């Protein structure tokens, strides 16, 4: 079975949030989909080890914020790769309170849904949670973020708790057996640059010397070896020492 085939399935990227007894929690998800129109219901897939999952089950409420294509990567880093036990993810985040009482994240979002849990299914490592949509709103007409764009632009890996997680070593092995003709076609279209790429071992973000990191003043063409020692991953804030050459 070739696992890269799963990358052909289409997903968006969403921020799931909930609250119980004054405790706000949230995480980044790519498995949110509408299951019925009347009544309007959404389904989300939540890993059992996520703190947010238990809060959703206990409170019976959750919100879904649809992230925009040009998302603030700090939101991805905090909500996607940090634990709610270790960090107040909502500090400095623009939110409103939904009818259900769930927090709704407005930053980097194009739409939101307020949901009440109506059922859940134990899938082993995950729960499939069905929520009735009690309210929704469109924030802007900007293009929503897709998982394909996220993966290709930021060269990111899915977190281990994601339903779509695939071990990088398996993907690398599958890539190594691509027919030579296909590899040559990819190489023919690839930009010519002799710099080395470096991957954050925490979140999978790839530093590409050809692009640099203009957000912190690192110009295109800057080798990772020449990046300042206090450089940190723009996604998960990991130190430079957590990057490995690929």
Language model features: what each stretch is:
Residues 1-191:
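Basic, polyanion-binding surface patches
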Residues 16-18, 196-201:
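A short beta-strand micro-motif
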Residues 194-196, 229-230:
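Short metal-coordination and nucleic-acid-contact micro-motifs, chiefly zinc-binding Cys/His arrays
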Residues 200-203, 233-236:
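Short cysteine-rich clusters marking metal-coordination/redox-active sites
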Residues 204-209, 227:
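Cys/His-rich short segments
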Residues 209-210, 241-245:
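Short, non-ligating residues that shape and space the ligands of small metal-coordination modules
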Residues 215-230:
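Short linker/helix segments within small regulatory modules
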Residues 225, 238-241:
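Cys/His-rich finger/ribbon microdomains and the adjacent scaffold used
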């Amino acid at each position: 079975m070739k696992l890269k085939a799963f990358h052909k399935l289409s997903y968006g990227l969403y921020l799931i949030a909930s609250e119980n007894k004054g405790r706000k929690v949230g995480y980044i998800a790519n498995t949110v989909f509408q299951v019925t129109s009347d009544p309007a219901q959404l389904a989300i897939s939540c890993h059992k080890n996520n703190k947010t999952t238990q809060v959703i089950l206990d409170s019976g409420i959750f919100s879904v914020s649809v992230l925009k294509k040009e998302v603030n990567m700090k939101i991805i880093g905090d909500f996607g790769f940090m634990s709610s036990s270790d960090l107040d993810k909502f500090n400095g985040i623009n939110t409103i309170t939904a009818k259900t009482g769930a927090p709704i994240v407005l930053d980097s979002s194009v739409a939101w849904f307020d949901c009440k849990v109506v059922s859940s299914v134990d899938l082993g490592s995950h729960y499939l949670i069905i929520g009735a949509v009690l309210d929704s709103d469109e924030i802007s007409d900007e293009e929503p973020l897709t998982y394909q764009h996220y993966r290709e632009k930021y060269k990111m890996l899915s977190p281990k708790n994601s339903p779509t997680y695939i071990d990088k070593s398996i993907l690398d092995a599958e890539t190594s057996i691509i027919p030579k003709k296909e590899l040559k076609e990819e190489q023919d279209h690839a930009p010519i640059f002799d710099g080395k790429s470096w991957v954050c071992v925490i979140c999978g973000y790839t530093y590409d010397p050809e692009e640099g990191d203009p957000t912190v003043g690192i110009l295109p063409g800057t080798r990772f070896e020449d990046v300042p020692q206090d450089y940190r991953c723009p996604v998960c804030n990991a130190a430079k020492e957590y990057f490995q050459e690929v």
